[in-house]
Amino acid sequence: MTGQRATPQPTLDDLPLRDDLRGKSPYGAPQLAVPVRLNTNENPHPPSRALVDDVVRSVARAAADLHRYPDRDAVQLRSDLARYLTAQTGVQLGVENLWAANGSNEILQQLLQAFGGPGRSAIGFVPSYSMHPIISDGTRTEWLQAARADDFSLDVDAAVAAVTERTPDVVFVASPNNPSGQSVSLSGLRRLLDAAPGIVIVDEAYGEFSSQPSAVQLVGEYPTKLVVTRTMSKAFAFAGGRLGYLIATPAVIEAMLLVRLPYHLSSVTQAAARAALRHADDTLGSVAALIAERERVSTALTGMGFRVIPSDANFVLFGEFTDAPASWQRYLDAGVLIRDVGIPGYLRATTGLAEENDAFLRASAQLAATELAPVNVGAIANAAEPRAAGRDRVLGAP
């Protein structure tokens, strides 16, 4: 203010922050205005005109009641989700099996509020989705981790051994895994469920792209252990709508009611998500095209000399670069934003539209000539331990 001495703005160090949060890095993927954005695994196909019109009409109807709180339990939305999943998985589901929230990260947070917390632990198999440890930290759940195999796939024997030895209260399994893209078979999941003493969360954010059956098929076999989480941010092209959900036995839904904030899901979000579900067949029609593009990109990268990790999602992890952060910058200089997920020698690229993928491949061809390291399979094991986060390097998110 005029006439007064300026008071220095406090820093984070000046605040009475919890000690266990000091020194932590927040999640952050760059949001940059570049010609080609392939860094956050969104569906590049925009919503259809019919879907947009439906959302506008639905939100307009909801807006007439904005002076009232929304449906606290989102019953109609959960019923729509149950119908969609019943058709997709072949498993008969009802509203009592579904819970919804603002993105799958809020779902994961609620699960750890209910089944994690002080004195409890959660384990994940790295490299994997970076929000699993971040949400664990935020809920005071001790984070444990075990390494994946040298090719970044889940070594089920090693995973079972780690769960048996460390007896975590919560086990995270991403299938398909982010950032490597591999899915876990139902037989592998059964072995983990048999070994786990507590809850197993199968994170199926990219489930619509997977060639493996959904873990939803196992909910009836493991009603006190299995929770499957999903999102509408990826295949459903609804990232801006922020809608995540889980599938589980009704008792798990009752647990969510104990920890959710009242009226957590706005009437606008519920209306827009229900409209998106009405157009599921049209929107998900892009999945086959994206899988075909993913395979085209993978084949082209392999032909250039890159090591491409076989993917079951809408992205590919590829390398091996002599200096991945420097290569990430060179892609950006070429107008292509991809992701440095913190694995030494590797970068991740979302599958975009054909013309976006062509631009990415042109940049890749230029980099392949000068920036690839000699393949050293033995060194890949070290990639399971992420380097320190910096710029965009938060392991595997989103």
UniProtKB/Swiss-Prot annotation:
It is an enzyme of class 2 (transferase). Its cofactor is pyridoxal 5'-phosphate. PROSITE patterns: AA_TRANSFER_CLASS_2. Its EC number is 2.6.1.9. Keywords: Amino-acid biosynthesis, Aminotransferase, Histidine biosynthesis, Pyridoxal phosphate, Transferase. Gene3D superfamilies: Aspartate Aminotransferase, domain 1, Type I PLP-dependent aspartate aminotransferase-like (Major domain). The keyword S-adenosyl-L-methionine does not apply. Belongs to the class-II pyridoxal-phosphate-dependent aminotransferase family. Histidinol-phosphate aminotransferase subfamily. Homodimer. This is Histidinol-phosphate aminotransferase.
